[in-house]
Amino acid sequence: MPRKAKLTSDESDRKDQRERTEKLHMTLESADKLSETAPQHLTGEAKKMWETIVPFLNESGYVINADSSAVETLAMNYQMLREAYESVKTVGIFYKAGEKYFKNPAVGIIDSATKVIKSVGSDLGLSPQSRATLIDMANSDDEDETDWEGRFGG
């Protein structure tokens, strides 16, 4: 599997990497930014997460208003993760009912929410590797302009 493209504007990095990064920024520059005010239905930790992460995402230039449902999903799952963790801290991983021990359902919520956060966070470009993937998507438009016949002797 080939290495994912790198997002960078550092002059010490390769020229093609810098050009791809610039192209992606230019493509998204005119798009509407995310509202820094959380949707009204988000409360508590979800609202805090939205208001913390959206300024960073807007500044990054890789996320636009069309991505608001992904940011909302991230914020809601973060709140679920925090609430489930509080349950585990209070009740424990297992609880006793009668003579039997049962796994705290919050453990499953932590597992599920963590996976969603990792996946959606990656989709939003919150890891270096996922940011590099965004460049590849921006370059896919170039294929339409490529002279494939000329490239392959046709």
Question: Where are the predicted features?
Answer:
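Arg/Lys-rich, low-complexity, intrinsically disordered N-terminal tails that contact nucleic acids
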Residues: 1-48, 132-154
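Amphipathic alpha-helical protein-protein interaction segments
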Residues: 2-5, 10, 14, 74-84, ...
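Extended, surface-exposed interaction regions
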Residues: 16-96
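Generic secondary-structure boundary/loop-capping signal
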Residues: 39, 54, 60, 107, ...
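Short, structured secondary-structure boundary patches
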Residues: 88, 119-121, 150-153
